[in-house]
C-alpha cells in the first residue's frame, strides 16, 4: 500500500539516473556500475569502490525534508548511486523492507541527544546496510544458476547483522570470520546458531587478521574462479551507502530545535562516518562531525598530526570498534579530494580509553537515567568522562 502512495505522491525533485560508475581508489581497474561493484565487493586492483560523481540534491528538497516519509527521503538520497541497476519500483520496495523499524532520537540532556540505531532485528546499527545489501544481491542473482558467496569479517555487530539479513536468501551463501574471544557471547550466538546458508568461522587472531583474510580471498585467482565472491563489510558499497539514511532521519528529528547539528559518530572501520559525509555532500546541512574512537586511535592521531600511521589492534570493551587500520578512511580522504585542511575543518577526532568509557556510562546513567553501551558511550565521552 505504501508503495502506491509513494508513486502517487512522488517527490517532484526525483530524477532517473541512468548510470552511476564506481572507480577503484587504486585507479588501476575499469569503472563498474552499481550492480557489478556490489557483486565484486572490492575492485580487482584491491581498491575500494567510490562513486565517480556525486550530485547534490535539490535545495528545495533539502529545505522540505520534514514533509516527506523516511522511505521517500531514502529513495531520493540513494537513487543516483543505483543508476539503472535496479528498477524504481524494486528499489522502493527494497527501501521499505530495509527501513521497517524506527530510529528514536532520545534527549540525554540539554542540546545532547542519542540517535538510537539498535531497534533492528539484531540490535545493531548495521542492520540497515546488511538488509539493503541482501535485498540488492537477491535481485541481482535471481535469474542466475550460479550461487554467490558473501565473505565477511566482523568485530561483532557486522556478522550478526549480515547473518540475519541474508538468512534464507536464495542463491546466496554467507561465510563470516570473527576473532576468537573478542566478540560478545550474544553476537557469537547470533552468527553461529542460524545454520542454513550461514557459516561462521572463529579465527585465532584479531579483526584486522579477519579483514586481511577477506581481502586476500578476493585476490586469489584460483578461489574466485571456483566461487562467485562478494563482501558484506562496509567495503561493499551496498553495505556502506545506505547508512546515510539515518543521518537524514536524525537530522530531521533534531532540526526542529533550530540549532546547528553536529554528529558524534562512534567509529571503528569508519564506514558509518563516511556515509554521513556522503549525506553532507548531498546537501544535508550538518554543521560538524566528531570521529570518536576507543584507544585504537589511528584516525584521531591523523587528524591531529596529518600523519596516517596504523597501529596493531588493541582489545577494548567497545570490541566492535577495535580496528587498527580502518579500511574506509581512504574513502573519507576521497570525499575531500585528499585535502587535509578541508577534512580537518569538517571532522574532529577524539579517542577514549576503557576507564573514560566506563565513567561516561556511569555519569550518563546517574545524571539522565539513560543506559548506554560502551560503543555509544564513546560518542559521548567527550562530554561525560
Regions found by a protein language model. Give the residues of each.
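Charged, compositionally biased N-terminal leader segments and the immediate start
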Residues: 20-45, 315
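Small-residue-rich anion-binding loops in enzyme active sites
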Residues: 48-123, 194-224
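Well-ordered mid-protein domain cores that form the structural environment of catalytic cofactors
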Residues: 114-168
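Short glycine/serine/threonine-rich phosphate/pyrophosphate-binding segments
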Residues: 127, 133, 151-164, 184-185, ...
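Active-site/ligand-binding loops adjacent to catalytic centers
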Residues: 187-235, 239, 291-378
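Domain-scale recognition of functional cores that engage charged ligands
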Residues: 212-216, 225-278, 284
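Conserved small/polar residues in nucleotide/adenosyl-binding loops
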Residues: 383-385
